[in-house]
């Protein structure tokens, strides 16, 4: 028989840098999960990724306090900032533009995020990421 699910915990944790301090410790401690066990497993799974890149993770906690987790791809905004080389998006995206993103960069980001996105083709995923770029104050080259 399948295990009974107690809770789902959604977090964003820096790749290879999970530790028991907030936000990981309190979120998992409330559910009675062994925090160090999660940290070791998460760090092992994300060691191939760039250290410090925020990785969304969904942790399924079962009634017997065991857990499984699924890592997602980094948020599109983080990948866009990295591609353009900026620290943060624009505070006034309709007035102040902070950088330019090319179609090739959009394609690379769409291919990276393809598993976590809806959309039939890579072009529709590129349009979605272009919308994120515009809302951050980036100019999208045609």
UniProtKB/Swiss-Prot annotation:
Pfam families: Ribosomal_L11, Ribosomal_L11_N. GO terms for biological process: translation. One or more lysine residues are methylated. InterPro entries: Ribosomal_uL11 (IPR000911), Ribosomal_uL11_bac-typ (IPR006519), Ribosomal_uL11_C (IPR020783), Ribosomal_uL11_C_sf (IPR036769), Ribosomal_uL11_N (IPR020784), Ribosomal_uL11_N_sf (IPR036796). SUPFAM superfamilies: Ribosomal L11/L12e N-terminal domain (SSF54747), Ribosomal protein L11, C-terminal domain (SSF46906). Keywords: Methylation, Ribonucleoprotein, Ribosomal protein, RNA-binding, rRNA-binding. GO terms for cellular component: cytosolic large ribosomal subunit. One of its GO terms (molecular function) is structural constituent of ribosome. NCBIfam families: L11_bact. Part of the ribosomal stalk of the 50S ribosomal subunit. Interacts with L10 and the large rRNA to form the base of the stalk. L10 forms an elongated spine to which L12 dimers bind in a sequential fashion forming a multimeric L10(L12)X complex. Forms part of the ribosomal stalk which helps the ribosome interact with GTP-bound translation factors. PANTHER family: 60S RIBOSOMAL PROTEIN L12, LARGE RIBOSOMAL SUBUNIT PROTEIN UL11M. Belongs to the universal ribosomal protein uL11 family. HAMAP family: Ribosomal_uL11. This is Large ribosomal subunit protein uL11. It comes from Haemophilus ducreyi (strain 35000HP / ATCC 700724).
